[in-house]
Amino acid sequence: MSSSDISVVVCVYTEDRWEDILAAVSSVRAQSLPALETLLVVDHNATLLERLTREYKETDAVRVLANAGPRGLSAGRNTGIAASRGEIIAFLDDDAVAERDWLRHFAAGYADPRVMAVGGRTMPIWASGRRPAWFPEEFDWVVGCTYKGLPPGRVRVRNVLGGNASFRRTAFDAAGGFATGIGRDGDKRPLGCEETELCIRLTRAEPDAILLIDDRAVIHHRVPEARERFGYFRTRAYAEGLSKALVARSVGSGKGLESERRYATRVLPAGVARGLRDALLARPGGAGRAAAIVTGVLTAAGGYVLGSVRARRGGATFSVVEIEGVPDDEGAAA
């Protein structure tokens, strides 16, 4: 696969991440397999849109455009997909940097024409310099990173993780775009699962489709100090439960919770056992990790129950949009 086949979409929303955004773009421009283009999609922030347009107006292959849909990450990604030119569309978080061979490893996965998506491994960069002793690796998804329990290597999966992922353009032709109403909206309650819902929808539309995670496609994701705290851990776990309820409503609880059942019955009990063992051996954080796993499970379950009730009552909605080309509106007001 040539460099001309890959577009990279980075969705941004706040000037507070200015240096992170510049670092993310620089990491894409330094790839051993160059991207066709990098698209910065600004989520309804006119000041940031104007500033980024000035920053990159002389830079080849970096395009800045406004989110053409409702506020939120899903609509921003859909805007990037519609405006992109590559046959493969990769997504990178705005507070992450990609290793040099990130796109090369993505591209290798598409040698098989049945492969419709390839994700990678996301490693945390803790603001404090180290992982909090109580924070279990099994819950690294709380901070947008690859969690303990995912299989190593290049493996087939139910869904990729959105901040470090790529899709064939034809995947969106078959399944539509990311569902709005599920994912994040700036700094509001940290919902997620929009990529899970999309991937399940994709494999239903294309039963022969293969989705992969290749752990050699590595990005490093910054975890701010506020997200190292137990309060955020609980909030994010609760929001995950709310999101999973929406996914189950869309695709059914069987497929929607298939991976989560394995995770809850195999990975998490082993994590609790390790934490308790470490506590007995007087190793730092063991009891805290075991308690955090139990708390995370119960909190997510509570969110799922409430989300399911809301969904049945019609209090939670989302929609799937078809991806259509959008006009080139670089520098337009958000």
Language-model regions: role of each:
Residues 25-66:
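Acidic donor-binding segment of Leloir-type glycosyltransferases
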